[in-house]
Amino acid sequence: MTRGLLISVGQHSDKGRKPVNQDFHGVLIPEEPLLSLKGIAAVLADGISSSTVSQIASESAVKSFLMDYYCTSESWTVKTSARRVLEATNSWLHAQTRKSQYAYDRDKGYVCTLSAMVIKAATAHIFHVGDCRIYRLAGKALEQLTDDHRIIVSSEQTYLGRALGINPQLEIDYQTVEIQAGDTFLLATDGAYEFVDARFVTSAINEHAAELDGAAKAIVEEAYRRGSDDNITVQILRIDAVPEETGVFDRTSTLPLPPLLEPRAMFDGYRIIREIHGSSRSHIYLAVDAETEETVALKIPSIDLRDNQAYLKRFLMEEWIARRIDSPYVLKPRSRSTRRNYLYVATEFVEGQTLRQWMLDNPRPDLETVRRIIEQIATGLRAFHRMEMLHQDLRPDNVLIDKTGTAKIIDFGSVRVAGVAEAAPRAADAEILGTVQYTAPEYFLGQGGSPRSDMFSLAAICYQMLTGHLPYGAQLAKIRGRSDAWKLRYRPAIDAERGIPGWIDGALRKALHPDPYKRHEDMSEFVFELRNPNPAYLNTRITPLLERNPLMFWKLTSAALACAVVVLLALLHAR
């Protein structure tokens, strides 16, 4: 049985010597699949003492984090999800203050400090603003993991430098900590940590190891006994088990693999019409839903790869990914009300042809047609990128052009989902999944991909549509190290006969640069430059062969000289 993430929790809060408890805290341990996809969240907030409404701020901050974090996209990383939630909470709190009688006195507004920890797989993600603290127990000592955002005026006077709700823009500290079974973390407000030492904390945790609520209560009571004049809150998290690094979709599907299908056969409520495509990776069939009469495409795993667990894991993810992308330029999944009995993927049927076939049928397309297709593909890719996904295998075979000229991105078997990759970071980038001719150089260098890598693939397709060949030919397949990447020679796309101006070549050259940091910062910038001449490219000329490929220039020069010598010798001999 696969081991999952297990923790023990202890919490206690007390108003102490104050009339109102302005602290708030909470822990949420979700069920699967959210446990693997989003992790366990623990949050602690402390309302500022100068405000009579800060308890509302701290309660709102904790509740919104625990509720909204799990409503963010499952494909997002912990960092992205938590930041979006905290930024939204900060904006709401700041707006509440501006609408209240405390608009011109922020020290009396809806302001609180906050520290949060999200434990996902074997990593603790820490988010912090203010002066709550997060510690890790190290033997009999406490290792402080957060920094207090306090500005020291004198030995007796300090004030908060950062907090939720105090400014319209939020600056959050973020860090990650690798965890292992047995690790213990402590979250505490200043009413606790300023009055209780590490020796008492570790002693209380060890004494109440079987019941951590008792440890938290003992620490709070000791802080009160030692004179704490503030609200006192403590949370204790102990890691009991860390999940094996297998990934979210590594559990073998309980559904059986389907057989090869024949025309006119009935399969799981679908009537098979014919096979559309067959390859070493999968088989795709045209089918009709017997219940709705809707035409669909069914994709089943290849027989040759049915024992390949890595392939089956990626196959399981394809429909999951498709359901999280909403774009007219990305293939849409299809679902049925009845229970599925086999492992396959059902999608909309697109009547058309692959971009590869379209390029063969249209070897010299006009520039405007190319622009329209590239713009559609770029829009589809941006839908992936908004969800923190990378396609990683964009090529003409993975784009369909329907009868109306609409482009649709297909095949999600190589897609990298950042939020899922966090669950198995060492396995996430283990192999290059894309097609070599369209794969960005950084993948070959083991650097991993980014949205700029997908842009490289898109630019390579654009280049091929305009010129009929690839920008680097077969050079990409020869990359073995950084020096090989810098040796790549871009072949200019300028072609007066084809009507490709220099500024188009300039846009392509930049998007296809071997160094991802020298490409366009965003795909929209590249697409914009395909329609709007960048002044920097307007004087672009056809680069002489000597500059483009000095080695080839001297080889040709030497060959020409050799031929000339042979001719001269022949003439002399004839005399």
What are these regions (language model features)?
Residues 379-389:
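Protein kinase catalytic-loop region centered on the HRD/HxD motif
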Residues 437-537:
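C-terminal lobe helix-coil module of Hanks-type protein kinase domains
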Residues 398-409:
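Conserved protein kinase catalytic/activation segment
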Residues 326-334:
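Conserved HxN/HPN-centered segment at the entrance to the catalytic loop
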Residues 355-365:
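AlphaC helix of the protein kinase catalytic domain
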Residues 1-297, 303-317, 338-346, 350, ...:
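PP2C/PPM-type serine/threonine phosphatase catalytic domain
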Residues 373-374:
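Activation segment signature within eukaryotic-like protein kinase domains
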